[in-house]
Amino acid sequence: MDAGASYMRLTGEENWVEVTMDEEKERKGKDVQQGKYRPQVSKPIINRDTNTSFAYKGIFLWGIQITMWILLWTNMCVRAEDYITLISDPYGFSPIKNVSGVPVTCVTKEFARWGCQPLGAYPDPEIEYRNVSQEIVKEVYQENWPWNTYHWPLWQMENVRYWLKENIAENKKRKNSTKKGIEELLAGTIRGRFCVPYPFALLKCTKWCWYPAEIDQETGRARKIKINCTEARAVSCTEEMPLASIHRAYWDEKDRESMAFMNIRACDSNLRCQKRPGGCVEGYPIPVGANIIPENMKYLRGQKSQYGGIKDKNGELKLPLTVRVWVKLANVSTWVNGTPPYWQNRINGSKGINGTLWGQLSGMHHLGFNLSQTGKWCNYTGKIKIGQETFSYHYKPNWNCTGNWTQHPVWQVMRDLDMVEHMTGECVQRPQRHNITVDRNQTITGNCSVTNWDGCNCSRSGNYLYNSTTGGLLVIICRNNNTITGIMGTNTNWTTMWRIYRNCSGCENATLDRKETGTLGGVANKNCSLPHKNESNKWTCAPRQREGKTDSLYIAGGKKFWTREKAQYSCENNIGELDGMLHQQILLQKYQVIKVRAYTYGVIEMPENYAKTRIINRRKRELSHTRKKRGVGLVIMLVIMAIVAAAGASLGVANAIQQSYTKAAVQTLANATAAQQDALEATYAMVQHVAKGVRILEARVARVEAITDRIMLYQELDCWHYHQYCVTSTRADVAKYINWTRFKDNCTWQQWERELQGYDGNLTMLLRESARQTQLAEEQVRRIPDVWESLKEVFDWSGWFSWLKYIPIIVVGLVGCILIRAVICVCQPLVQIYRTLSTPTYQRVTVIMEKRADVAGENQDFGDGLEESDDSKTDQKVTVQKAWSRAWELWQNSPWKEPWKRSLLKLLILPLTMGIWINGRLGEHLKNKKERVDCETWGKGD
């Protein structure tokens, strides 16, 4: 029975005893109880340098790892999460608003000829892409896919324009020949892709639709038509398209799919335009405020726009667009003879058809030819159009201009002046002011507004002035006696309008009642029509008259409700009229330039649930501390592989660039050699001609000398040119002495000099061209870079590779760290085994008693605290043999039974023996310093 139980039995009081047991991991000298127990074996071991060295070793290893991580982090600067790009991360990429600063290059065949990169320099966008979820696209672009004026097509057009101006003299000389290769470029048959380098990429929209935004409550027009992209993917290059082209009406069949994708449909199926016969407008809406040619390239704008409906309010390209323009692939399947099916409704060949003003009715400019709309004739013009300029150029490509081009894809440009595409896809002929009358016969029933055309009905064709329920005025256009084709509105109320009307000259008693004049009706007096402001900003009700002609006054909504409007039709359409620059500009609108955090090639599909992936990655990071050894090796291996991969990729790109420069230089050198050969041939021909003249001169001099010697009539000697040989005025028998027949085929001196001058001019030109080609070849050869110069030029690392000279040191350091780590990993278990064998493990038992227990034998004399210590009774000296026996016994009783571990333990017997012997020797000087423990005398309980 323990002391606590005896105390309870005797006193009846509880004696609470707290017993705590914990493993003694950190041994300190002050925690060791002195008394009966001799200083333990572990105490001198703890006081030695063994444990501190291992602590320093751990700190040193951690320092090495932290240093390596810092070095790797500063050099790589990429986290593991950054390798997963554009995947369920709205901040994985950022849109680039100013695309003019984005570097771009073209990729095509014969790249050195056209200043592009080889086809393998960038991955194929059909293979290399990354899908981007709809949520990310919506969050980044807010359902508004913006318009961008890309500078790449403008650069291409500028290059062609510059080349045409530089070779204008040569072009005038060529009459019946073409320059091979250039015609292919001008015709758009040289195709390629536009690519952007890392860290930039292209976000390609693969599914989109349009919807109206910012509806004007006064006019009902949509200030903006926004594009909502619902599916997108990231690529490096665009689709294949012509690198350049002059003005053309029809495009190749290869472009049909890309052009058809630009026919964007409306998102909302409940829009009013969906219920109309023609449906809603399809196409790409170039927004209001777009700059087709930016300010920094204003020299390309020209005077008048050559792009049909793509123009500003002055018919030029100097100002931003003030009216929305739609560009779409024309639906030629329903056309008749190359024209829309309703063109037969034209009146006397008018350009206005069904509310649309059409341009280019007779013919279209196509690759230097004038083609008819029906495809029945084509005329060679001798001129080509590039941008806003026209050049005289002999251009006859190898295609049949008389073929049936009407089935080829063609762009249709529509300029919607009213901008009410969400209400109707039909165009209307605007009414004149004298055709606008007040409805007195209840022709209009219901309540409608500029935003609600279906709220009222009409029963008779006409143009009716209607008092809106919102307080403004409406002009309701009714056609076919029951169809409302348009509503124009203004915030000016009915009372204000009548006050202005009464102030017009001669209109004090006039009205706007309808008179039966024509199908649409009109007012009785045209000089008292709906009022408007003239050019002097004064109110008037009469149209302007000049030379017996009355000016036409049309009406539009909003601010133009009270001004003089000249446009008769609400839409302007044209087909063709675009060149390669604008063709590329339209096709590039499906792309947005973005900047990514990390860019890798290959197909990366979107994961189904990125949150689960992040949780798994977080769990892996939480467990990563158990794999530190493996992690360090893996990081080192990844670093080495990354360096090798980066070097390989960089060398590959540099090699491609070097081949490009080399090929260009070789081609230029070949041209120089050919020019030198031409100069040599011309020189040889000139030498032959000079030699021939010298022979003729010698022969003539010889004959003259013979005549003078034989006749000696110097004063009568006279030579003149006659039938290309020389005769004299002397006697006729003189001619028998000279045989002139051999010189009849020779030219005169004047002809010989003229021909010699021609040879001289030709030779001078050839020598000049040869020198220019030689100089150009030398410059091209000097431009051939080596691998490292190519890397610096392409990537602009500007000394980033300066640290490569430290790679051997880094590699040796890494190998040394690996070896040191391996040695430590081998020695650490041995040291741990040694510590385990040499240091017994104790448990600390703490007994706390509230009262002294009544224990029998409390008055017993226990001595001075040293009597019961067996070790203190006999002072035995520790010898080497005893230490060896003790070490051998520890090895025999070790808990490790595996053969390989026991073999390793044999190596520890000798150091263990030395440790035991040294501890024994060190313990001898403590025998006279034994501490006496005074035991408290326990009194007996009463």
UniProtKB/Swiss-Prot annotation:
Coiled coil: 663-713, 754-789
Assembly notes: The mature envelope protein (Env) consists of a trimer of SU-TM heterodimers attached by noncovalent interactions or by a labile interchain disulfide bond.
Site label Cleavage, positions: R630, G631
UniProt region (Fusion peptide), positions on chain: 631-651
GO cellular component: host cell plasma membrane; membrane; viral envelope; virion membrane
Function field: The surface protein (SU) attaches the virus to the host cell by binding to its receptor. This interaction triggers the refolding of the transmembrane protein (TM) and is thought to activate its fusogenic potential by unmasking its fusion peptide. Fusion occurs at the host cell plasma membrane. The transmembrane protein (TM) acts as a class I viral fusion protein. Under the current model, the protein has at least 3 conformational states: pre-fusion native state, pre-hairpin intermediate state, and post-fusion hairpin state. During viral and target cell membrane fusion, the coiled coil regions (heptad repeats) assume a trimer-of-hairpins structure, positioning the fusion peptide in close proximity to the C-terminal region of the ectodomain. The formation of this structure appears to drive apposition and subsequent fusion of viral and target cell membranes.
Extracellular side: 81-799
Residue ranges of the region described as Immunosuppression: 697-713
Transmembrane segments: 800-820
Stretch forming the signal peptide: 1-80
Hydrolase listed as a keyword: no
PTM annotation: Specific enzymatic cleavages in vivo yield mature proteins. Envelope glycoproteins are synthesized as an inactive precursor that is N-glycosylated and processed likely by host cell furin or by a furin-like protease in the Golgi to yield the mature SU and TM proteins. The cleavage site between SU and TM requires the minimal sequence [KR]-X-[KR]-R.
Glycosylated sites: 51, 98, 131, 176, 228, 331, 348, 354, 370, 379, 400, 404, 435, 441, 447, 457, 467, 481, 493, 503, 509, 527, 534
GO terms classed as biological process: symbiont entry into host cell; virion attachment to host cell
Keyword Disulfide bond: yes
Keywords tagged on the record: Cleavage on pair of basic residues, Coiled coil, Disulfide bond, Glycoprotein, Host cell membrane, Host membrane, Host-virus interaction, Membrane, Signal, Transmembrane, Transmembrane helix, Viral attachment to host cell, Viral envelope protein, Virion, Virus entry into host cell
Name of this protein: Envelope glycoprotein
Residues in compartment: Cytoplasmic: 821-942
